[in-house]
């Protein structure tokens, strides 16, 4: 007779604890596992409109045929069950130029069913002990087969949860088969996974099939995905992204259907029709159209990628809504990123990861270009050279000196007399002396140019200030996953490289990210900075305490950053003492709201405080949430226990993982 468990399991049932413990005590072999995986995706464009053109990776499906096929043969290298690399070796298909459409579908074929999150930090697994409180379970035992079927569903509907069932080996708790129904990044899916009984692979799937549907602004695309693991054909590591149906025919572990063969047969990329002479003139307009839409158009809305055995290059799309940022104090900005890596050997490679963008509030172009040579990855040894034009910096002393000489009646409001553009060069080396200690040393050069040159000349003030300084930094990580302590010293000297500023600065900082079961995260940060020597009150420029005019997203700088504090406040203080804390968790308060709560993926609470020379104490309280579309946060600031103002910040999250 079937037995049931709702919400909390009965004391006489051990099936759920066996599942929780199975992956812990049955890890794969310690040696690196290598698997060959065949993947087949079939797309059916049911409805589409012009908005499909601007969705990353969907450009190739925005026109032409409505059914497409894509096949890949891949090598997966598992370092452990949580960490693996997918290396594409052969690809074929009917999508133009063999483009990869909807890359987020790749996450669906290898869910980490025993982890807290199934898909790289998203969707809470029902088979992890930390998430048990979020699901209801029903158990049905088949004594004859020695298996148990466990049906699960969420206690509260949310895109971070799913429903389905699993067939489990009753005696051991090993999952033999699972069916998952849910939503992930605007994709509704149903995935069926069959798990291997082969030694060393028993907690990994050997075959999976997924039916997925993408709906967005009237566009509807359905996809069927088949993945087959443990394929016998072995390819050399030197083969990466070879193209051709003929090659795929020799590797494919399952035959194509009649409909799939027909898709290949009518694809011009594989069976081009020779043009007749009389058609040549008539096709010229189509060639121009192809150049415009396929070359220029695709470059605008999709990332530009290039990859070889030694080099990798990626530029974010030129037209990308994800690049738009807004904060109440910094205004709107648009930001792009470039990633480049060149590998000389396994232990030596060069990276260039610049970002550049435009801040509309102050109408200025910004960039930061770090060029890094990694020469000893094992000891975190690298040399880095960074060019940038940074954020504008205030110099309140300039206005004070002018008023002292020419009279207090002068009004410099809205004249940007104290604003300077900041260009810089940093050159330094980092090395891990011990497993818990890093030391970096180098040189820093700043050139600060007045924004209002005319007014500076009128009052006989310098237009350009330069500084040259050696620096030393120490990073201490006492234990793995513990707090990171840093101390930096920087000393500016006059007369070197036209430097006209002398100073000495010390800063200490401590940061700790404490991960709590259930995808919860507690961020703690504290820091102190001061100038031990300074001839004039020029350019208070702390490394760990400054505003940025090109802010990044939810996962980058929303924690540990002051959102409403005016830059002029900390640009005229000789010291700062700061403390920041934030708590992040899925399924807190907003999840319970009707209609919209099911789309809230994570929530975050902020508390920021700082003591400054002329502004103490200063507090910020904040609340934010993120989902598949957008991240939003609201902040309230208080100065000397008096309310100041409220501000907001948002980023687009839509298609961030595409």
What role is predicted for each listed range?
Residues 2-147, 155, 159-161, 217, ...:
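Structured extracytoplasmic
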Residues 187, 330-334, 363-367, 421-425, ...:
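Residues that define the transmembrane beta-barrel architecture of outer-membrane proteins
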Residues 192, 219-220, 366-369, 396-402, ...:
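Outer-membrane beta-barrel translocator domains and adjoining extracellular loop/strand segments
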Residues 328-330, 340, 412-446, 479, ...:
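Outer-membrane beta-barrel transmembrane strands
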Residues 334-340, 369-373, 425-431, 472-476, ...:
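Residues on the lipid-exposed face of transmembrane beta-strands in outer-membrane beta-barrel proteins
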Residues 344-351, 378-383, 435-441, 448-451, ...:
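Repeated loop/turn-to-beta-strand initiation elements of outer-membrane beta-barrel proteins
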Residues 382-400, 410-417, 486-589:
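C-terminal outer-membrane beta-barrel translocator/porin domains of Gram-negative envelope proteins
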């Amino acid at each position: 007779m079937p037995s049931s468990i709702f919400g909390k399991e009965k004391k006489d049932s051990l099936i759920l604890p066996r599942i929780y413990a199975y992956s812990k005590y049955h890890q794969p072999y310690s040696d690196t596992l290598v698997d060959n995986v065949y993947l087949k995706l079939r797309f059916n464009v049911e409805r589409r409109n012009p908005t499909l053109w601007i969705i990353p990776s969907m450009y190739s499906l925005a026109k032409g045929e409505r059914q497409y096929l894509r096949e890949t043969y891949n090598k997966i290298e598992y370092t452990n069950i949580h960490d693996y690399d997918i290396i594409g070796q052969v690809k074929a298909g009917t999508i133009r130029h063999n483009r990869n459409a909807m890359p987020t579908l790749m996450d669906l074929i290898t869910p980490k069913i025993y982890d807290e999150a199934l898909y790289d930090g998203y969707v809470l697994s029902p088979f992890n002990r930390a998430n048990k409180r979020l699901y209801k379970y029903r158990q049905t035992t088949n004594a004859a087969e020695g298996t148990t079927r466990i049906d699960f569903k969420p206690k509260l509907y949310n895109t971070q949860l799913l429903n389905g069932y699993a067939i489990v080996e009753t005696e051991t708790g090993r999952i033999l088969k699972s069916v998952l129904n849910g939503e992930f990044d605007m994709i509704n899916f149903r995935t069926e996974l069959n798990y291997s009984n082969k030694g060393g692979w028993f907690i990994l799937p050997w075959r999976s099939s997924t039916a997925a549907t993408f709906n967005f602004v009237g566009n509807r695309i359905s996809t069927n995905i088949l993945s087959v693991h443990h394929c016998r054909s072995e390819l050399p590591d030197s083969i990466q992204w070879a193209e051709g149906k003929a090659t795929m025919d020799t590797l494919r572990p399952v035959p194509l259907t009649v409909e799939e063969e027909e898709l290949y047969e009518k694809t011009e990329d594989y069976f081009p029709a020779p043009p007749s002479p009389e058609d040549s003139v008539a096709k010229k307009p189509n060639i121009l159209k192809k150049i415009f839409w396929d070359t220029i158009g695709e470059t605008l809305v999709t990332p530009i990628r290039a990859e070889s055995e030694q080099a990798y290059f990626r530029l974010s799309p030129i037209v990308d809504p994800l690049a738009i940022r807004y904060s109440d104090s910094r205004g709107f900005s648009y930001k792009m990123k470039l990633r480049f890596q060149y590998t000389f050997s396994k232990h030596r490679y060069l990276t260039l990861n610049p970002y550049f963008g435009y801040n509309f509030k102050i109408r200025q172009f910004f960039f930061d270009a770090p060029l890094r040579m990694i020469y000893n990855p094992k000891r975190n040894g690298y040399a880095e050279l960074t060019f940038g034009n940074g954020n504008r910096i205030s110099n309140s002393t300039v206005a004070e000196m002018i008023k002292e000489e020419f009279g207090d009646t002068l009004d410099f409001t809205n004249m940007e007399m104290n604003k300077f553009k900041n260009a810089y060069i940093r050159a330094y080396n980092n090395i891990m002396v011990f497993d818990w200690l890093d030391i970096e040393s180098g040189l820093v050069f700043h050139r600060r140019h007045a924004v209002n040159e005319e007014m500076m000349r009128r009052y006989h003030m310098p237009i350009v200030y330069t500084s040259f300084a050696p620096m030393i930094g120490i990073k201490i990580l006492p234990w793995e996953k513990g707090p990171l302590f840093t101390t930096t010293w920087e000393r500016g000297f006059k007369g070197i490289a036209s430097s006209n500023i002398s100073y000495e600065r010390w800063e200490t900082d401590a940061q700790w990210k404490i991960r709590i079961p259930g995808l919860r995260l507690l961020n703690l940060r504290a820091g102190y900075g001061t100038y031990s020597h300074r001839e004039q009150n020029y350019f208070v420029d702390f490394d760990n305490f400054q505003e940025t005019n090109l802010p990044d997203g939810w996962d980058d700088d929303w924690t540990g950053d002051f959102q409403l504090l005016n830059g002029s406040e900390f640009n005229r203080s000789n010291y700062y003492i700061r403390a920041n804390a934030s708590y992040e968790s899925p399924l807190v308060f907003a999840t319970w709201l009707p209609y919209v709560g099911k789309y809230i993926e994570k929530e975050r609470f902020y508390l920021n405080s700082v003591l400054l020379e002329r502004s103490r104490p200063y507090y910020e309280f904040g609340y934010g949430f993120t989902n598949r579309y957008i991240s939003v946060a609201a902040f309230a600031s208080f100065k000397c226990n008096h309310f100041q103002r409220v501000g907001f910040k948002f980023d687009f999250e839509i298609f961030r993982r595409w």
